Regions:
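Conserved class I S-adenosyl-L-methionine
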Residues: 1-35, 73, 143
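Short glycine-centered segments of the SAM/dcSAM-binding site in methyltransferase folds
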Residues: 39, 131-133
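Class I SAM-dependent methyltransferase SAM/SAH-binding core
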Residues: 41-95
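A short glycine-rich, Lys/Arg-flanked "PGG" loop and its adjoining helix->strand segment in the class I
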Residues: 118-130
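Short catalytic micro-motifs in class I SAM-dependent methyltransferases
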Residues: 109-110
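C-terminal alpha-helical "lid/dimerization" subdomain adjacent to the S-adenosyl-L-methionine
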Residues: 13-19, 133-157
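Short N-terminal helix/helix-N-cap motif within the alpha/beta-hydrolase-1
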Residues: 69, 98, 115-119, 144
Length: 157
């Protein structure tokens, strides 16, 4: 999977992906109060399509991804926009969790790539502060699209 996303890094910011990231960012802004006080984890944040707009409003954002090329693109954009409150980590949190908890964890179009939903759920809970929030944005299963989830799969987790 890492190789696939390294290969896609320079072309990942397509109009479709930018549009989807903007929708998620709007949902975060509507559902989360006082972003300026929040420490956010963008799990699998890739090229920073969510990280950068959130960092402009949040106390800090940690972008974690397994693809060094995706992170390279995110760093370049952060430098161009002079955004300094982002920590970039190339790391698989399932293998090496962080020793930090967050107010908000954002997981956008990543969960369907993870082979073990229970391990992912445990990982997110491990990294959330007691009153923290988890925002998941992923695909739903349809007859045409088998990637993603049916809502009951996630609701009781």
């Amino acid at each position: 999977m890492k190789h696939d996303f390294n290969h896609k890094a320079e072309t990942f910011d397509s109009p479709k992906n930018i549009f989807l990231a903007n929708l998620v960012c709007q949902a975060v802004e509507k559902q989360i109060d006082l972003l300026s006080d929040k420490e956010i984890l963008d799990f699998g944040g890739g090229t920073g399509l969510l990280t950068l707009p959130l960092a402009k409003q949040a106390k800090s954002v940690t972008l974690v991804d397994i693809s060094e090329k995706m992170l390279e693109q995110a760093r370049l954009k952060a430098e161009q926009q002079d955004i300094k409150n982002i920590q970039f980590l190339e790391q698989d949190l399932l293998e090496k969790p962080l020793e930090k908890e967050f107010d908000l964890i954002v997981v956008c179009r990543v969960l369907h790539h993870m082979p073990d939903l229970d391990a992912a759920r445990s990982l997110f809970h491990q990294h959330l502060k007691e009153d923290g929030q988890l925002l998941l944005a992923d695909f739903t299963k349809t007859e045409a699209n088998h990637h993603g989830f049916e809502l009951p799969e996630l609701e009781n987790k």
